[in-house]
């Protein structure tokens, strides 16, 4: 009897609790539909507002007279707005947009460092190591020795693509999903799927938008290189930021989906060219239709960089270089320049250090860099190699004036000093190098005129290798020029360098007194860049005052109304 009463009591309590819950639901429903119904209806009709970042226009680059090298053009990008792409539909929508891109023969951004086909392999490009490391972290903190096949399987599992029969398609979709995760795409940061698409594709995407939620078209800007061959030796290119670069940049200024200067002035002047992001508030209705878009914080475009280059002189330098190489090939013997197939030319203002022209041959067009990269990278003529700033070459007789300057500065010779040239230098019994001529007794002026080896053998011997190297450095050889972009340092002959370079010989070679003779005429281990040789000759012409070489003349605001910086001449040293 007691058990029955206890059961009845519990049943009564349960009934009361359930009744209270239903009463609560009823009250809430009444509040939503009757008391606050109009208010909530108005909110739904008004839509939802979210904030989106606005990309700034990248600063442009002009020649010294305002003629364009690198400018911007208006483009259209495909973006994936995560806020309106339910996770359950992501793979399906991405499959549809990929199919449309392939149908139109267009490419999309895919930085997944794994091949499209099985057996899956890792990519081997220059940034592969950091990209693969980042991929393994995102795929599931895989170990360093995990192979590409296992990594891909893990990624397909992660993105629910492991049961897809078409493995190549699964790889493509995974590439997009990976990039979305890697770049931090979210409701306020859309993912850029493809850049600079043609207007025909813009129209088609708008037609199919009802079937591809989250796929949108955004107006943007892209780099355009005017006369791309003329700027290839110093302008540089931009590209999507990679994992290694992202580790180095200020995260408050860059997104993983940003483009960044990769080399040349695009890289050196990145902070000047980048600009500052703005903010836009976008109001959308319940179906995702944009009701309004308001810029609440305008983007600030990057600055305009005025270079020191004279575009006309640059064009003349490139034409002249190509013409001279062809002339040498057609008229000279093979051992006297007939095999020449490449070169560089640099023109410098001796008083200011401004680089007026800097050209390489063979060259390439910046506009075609990415589309032709696979061919350019394996071209045996190395058009991508910047011979002006990074190629180092034995200078030969160009080096002789530095020995003459050193000899006079150290009191070894003066203007009237005479050296006997009898064709053979006989100071050593076991090593007697020769001159091409037999000039008799000559002074420095005549020795330079006829490029007499004997005069500089003797002057160099009396100076000693340390003084020769020191004065060469003071005149601009084997030291940084000051240029803003990447450069090789070259090297000046010294006993230490000589033995270091020959340590692997059997037996290893050691420095001897006779080596100074070859160093004195620009041979042995002397190797310098064309840019350094231009700095050196400019220093000689400027009475020993070595100027810092530079490519940036002035920095102005994007609209050219305000001068941000004017680069003044800088004296590095006086010899």
Can you describe what each PLM-predicted range is?
Residues 85, 193, 222, 257, ...:
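A general boundary/transition motif marking the beginning of the first structured unit of a protein
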Residues 91-99, 195, 199, 203-207, ...:
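Solvent-exposed, polar/charged alpha-helical surfaces in well-ordered, non-transmembrane soluble domains
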Residues 223-225, 314, 491-492:
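A short acidic, often aromatic-flanked loop/helix-cap motif at beta-alpha or helix-coil junctions
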Residues 1-273, 277-298, 326-344, 350, ...:
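Membrane-proximal periplasmic segments of bacterial cell-envelope enzymes
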Residues 16, 21, 218, 308, ...:
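Compositionally biased, intrinsically disordered low-complexity segments
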Residues 70, 76, 283-300, 309, ...:
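Beta-lactam-recognizing serine transpeptidase/beta-lactamase-like catalytic domain environment
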Residues 57, 88, 196, 225, ...:
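Residue-level detector of secondary-structure boundary/capping sites
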């Amino acid at each position: 009897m007691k058990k029955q009463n206890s059961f009845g009591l519990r049943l009564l309590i349960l009934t009361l609790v359930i009744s209270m819950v239903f009463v609560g639901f009823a009250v809430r429903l009444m509040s939503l539909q009757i008391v606050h119904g109009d208010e909530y209806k108005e909110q739904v009709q008004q839509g939802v507002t979210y904030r989106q970042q606005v990309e700034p226009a990248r600063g442009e680059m002009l020649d010294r007279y305002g003629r364009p090298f690198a400018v911007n053009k208006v483009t259209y990008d495909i973006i994936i707005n995560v806020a309106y792409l339910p996770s359950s539909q992501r793979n399906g929508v991405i499959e549809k947009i990929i199919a449309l891109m392939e149908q139109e023969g267009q490419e999309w951004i895919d930085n997944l460092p794994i091949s499209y086909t099985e057996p899956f392999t890792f990519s081997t490009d220059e940034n592969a190591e950091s990209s693969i490391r980042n991929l393994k972290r995102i795929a599931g903190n895989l170990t360093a020795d995990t192979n590409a096949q296992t990594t891909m399987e893990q990624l397909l599992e992660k993105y629910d693509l492991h049961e897809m029969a078409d493995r190549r398609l699964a790889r493509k979709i995974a590439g997009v999903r990976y990039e979305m995760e890697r770049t931090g795409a979210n409701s306020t940061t859309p993912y850029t799927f493809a850049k600079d698409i043609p207007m025909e594709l813009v129209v088609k995407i708008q037609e199919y938008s009802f079937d591809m939620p989250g796929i949108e078209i955004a107006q943007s800007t892209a780099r355009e290189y005017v006369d791309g061959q003329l700027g290839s030796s110093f302008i540089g290119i931009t590209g999507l930021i990679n994992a290694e670069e992202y580790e180095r940049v200020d995260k408050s200024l860059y997104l993983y989906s940003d483009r960044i200067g990769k080399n040349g002035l695009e890289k050196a002047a990145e902070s000047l060219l980048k600009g500052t992001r703005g903010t836009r508030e976008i109001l959308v209705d319940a179906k995702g239709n944009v009701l309004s878009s308001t810029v609440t914080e305008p983007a600030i475009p990057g600055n305009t960089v005025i270079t020191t280059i004279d575009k006309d002189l640059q064009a003349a330098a490139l034409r002249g270089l190509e013409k001279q190489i062809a002339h040498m090939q057609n008229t000279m013997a093979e051992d006297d320049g007939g095999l020449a197939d490449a070169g560089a030319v640099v023109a410098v203002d001796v008083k200011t250090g401004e680089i007026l022209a800097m050209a390489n041959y063979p060259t390439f067009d910046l506009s075609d860099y990415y589309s032709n990269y696979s061919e350019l990278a394996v071209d045996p003529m190395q058009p991508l190699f910047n011979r002006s700033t990074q190629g180092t070459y034995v200078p030969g007789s160009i080096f002789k004036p530095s020995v003459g300057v050193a000899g006079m500065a150290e009191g070894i010779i003066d203007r009237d000093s005479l050296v006997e040239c009898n064709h053979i230098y006989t100071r050593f019994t076991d090593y007697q190098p020769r001159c091409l001529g037999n000039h008799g007794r000559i002074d420095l002026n005549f020795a330079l005129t006829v490029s007499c080896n004997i005069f500089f053998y003797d002057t160099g011997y009396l100076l000693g290798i340390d003084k020769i190297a020191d004065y060469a450095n003071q005149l601009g050889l084997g030291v940084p020029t000051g240029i803003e972009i990447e450069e090789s340092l070259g090297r000046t002959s010294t006993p230490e360098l000589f033995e270091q370079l020959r340590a692997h010989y059997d037996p290893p070679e050691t420095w001897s007194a006779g080596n100074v003779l070859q160093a004195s005429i620009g041979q042995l281990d002397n190797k310098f860049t064309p840019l350094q040789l231009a700095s050196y000759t400019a220093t000689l012409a400027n009475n020993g005052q070595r100027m810092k070489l530079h490519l940036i003349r002035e920095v102005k605001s994007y609209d050219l109304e305000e001068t941000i910086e004017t680069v003044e001449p800088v004296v590095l040293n006086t010899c």
